[in-house]
A protein has these predicted regions:
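Residue-level signal for alpha-helix termini/capping positions
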Residues: 8-11, 41, 62, 97
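EAL-family c-di-GMP phosphodiesterase catalytic domain
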Residues: 16-29, 45-151
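Bacterial c-di-GMP phosphodiesterase EAL domain
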Residues: 1-13, 38-39
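Well-ordered, non-membrane alpha-helical segments in soluble/globular domains
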Residues: 1-5, 33-34, 89-90
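Short beta-alpha junctions and helix-cap segments that line functional grooves
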Residues: 33-36, 57
Length: 151
């Protein structure tokens, strides 16, 4: 509200103002930065997250040949009703698929989360609804199967 009033006082349209935000905000856990950014955009201001790239773990994922990628527990709490967050999760799952790594979502605690994951075709998850344990020797990696079929 302070920024909005300041812009009005100085005859500056909010859509002409862009706030530069460090990617560190993506690591926040209390939701305050996300809420502030949402409020700013609702007032007409623009927000630009800078520095995405070099230190971003998702961009470095291609350097590692992993059979599985365990996603942060935050992925489990994404609601099917939150379209933007769901789009981000779909993108990460598609990236894992392109890299031939099976994504694992951890801390699944309710049926709605499980339903959302099944709709996204995510087969691996942990938590109280995760099912039964299977010994590692019975789990074949997708990469090993691909190497056999390439021969």
């Amino acid at each position: 509200v302070f920024l909005s009033n300041l812009c009005k006082k100085n005859l500056i349209r909010p859509e002409r103002v862009c706030f530069e935000v460090s990617p560190i905000v993506l690591d926040e856990t209390d939701g305050k930065a996300a809420e502030t950014i949402k409020e700013l955009t609702e007032l007409g201001f623009h927000v630009m997250i800078t520095g995405m790239g070099g230190s971003c773990p998702i961009l470095k994922l291609g350097e590692f040949r992993a059979d599985y990628v365990m996603l942060d527990p935050y992925a489990a709490v994404i609601s099917a009703d939150d379209e933007r967050s769901l789009t981000c999760l779909k993108t990460v799952l598609n990236l894992c698929d392109e890299l031939r790594a099976n994504p694992i979502i951890c801390d699944i605690s309710d049926k709605s989360q499980l339903k959302t994951l099944k709709e996204l075709e995510c087969s691996y998850y942990t938590g109280k609804l995760s099912g039964t344990f299977m010994a590692e020797k019975y789990v074949r990696s997708r990469n090993a199967d691909d190497e056999k079929s390439d021969s």
